[in-house]
Regions:
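Intrinsically disordered, metal-sensing/regulatory segments
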Residues: 2-259
Length: 259
């Protein structure tokens, strides 16, 4: 693997532990949620633009899932841990998403105001469910070579902007205040940082097979989230063009991870 794929240069954090470094990069990835929310609340972004940006972010995340998580897990521990992790992550997200959908969080990422009839608590939990697997992936990436994977952080950052942009627009149309919406995403950012730290802290001394299962678990959850929310929303707003834009996002992340 090339140097860039192995990781980002560590920030100057003095004697701060690697766990705090993981939290820092989790915060960086999650901070994009605040950026997207501000854009969605301040500017009237055309739905087609939101759809295209979501498609690009989906392509970036698919690449990170394939090469930064799944491939590395397979290289270190073989096929069985990858299959178990992918299946477990996908099933966990599916069940959690299904439960939240039936308690008022079904349209939490939509931009058309469908959240009006939703349960605010379920919407918050749904946002956390979407963000935690990505953040855990950031923390776990630190376990490979001691530096966080640039493609993982970039993928999470680029995908989070359109996610929160779309959701913030919809939540505002549904009648939620700007303060409530920004508070929601701020909470998700904090939890994202904690999840990234936990991803490293809980697995720092774990055997390679455990790390591989965790990588694949995060990959399965993220992939299921993409297919369930981001990709359908992108297609709804931007039509068949999203296929090309998704491919471009995949290519961009692939080249970034192999630079």
């Amino acid at each position: 693997m090339q140097a860039l794929r192995r990781g980002l240069v560590r920030p100057c954090l003095g004697s701060t532990s690697v766990v705090w470094e993981a939290a820092f990069w989790g915060f960086v990835g999650g901070f994009a949620l605040l950026i997207g929310a501000v854009v969605g609340l301040v500017w009237r972004t055309p739905p087609r633009v939101i759809g295209l940006v979501m498609a690009f972010g989906a392509g970036v995340l698919i690449s990170a899932v394939a090469f930064e998580l799944t491939e590395e897990a397979f290289e270190t521990s073989g096929g069985l841990p990858v299959v178990l992790g992918l299946g477990g992550g996908a099933l966990t997200f599916f069940v959690g998403d299904w439960v939240l959908d039936h308690h008022g969080a079904k349209h939490r990422k939509r931009s058309g105001g469908q959240q009006a009839g939703g349960n605010p608590s379920a919407i918050v939990l749904g946002a956390l469910l979407d963000g935690i697997p990505e953040s855990v992936a950031i923390g776990v990436s630190l376990l490979r070579g001691g530096a966080v994977g640039v493609a993982v952080v970039a993928a999470v950052f680029l995908s989070n902007v359109p996610e929160s942009m779309s959701a913030a627009t919809g939540l505002r149309k549904a009648g939620h205040s700007r303060t409530w919406i920004m508070g929601l995403w701020l909470a998700v950012v904090v939890v994202s940082a904690a999840a990234a730290a936990a991803g490293y802290g809980l697995l720092g001394d774990a055997p390679p097979v455990t790390i591989a299962v965790t990588q694949a678990f995060a990959a399965g959850a993220v992939l299921t989230m993409l297919a369930d929310t981001m990709m359908p929303e992108g297609f709804e707003h931007a039509g068949s063009t999203v296929g090309l834009v998704t491919c471009f996002g995949f290519i961009t992340a692939f080249l970034l991870s192999h630079a």
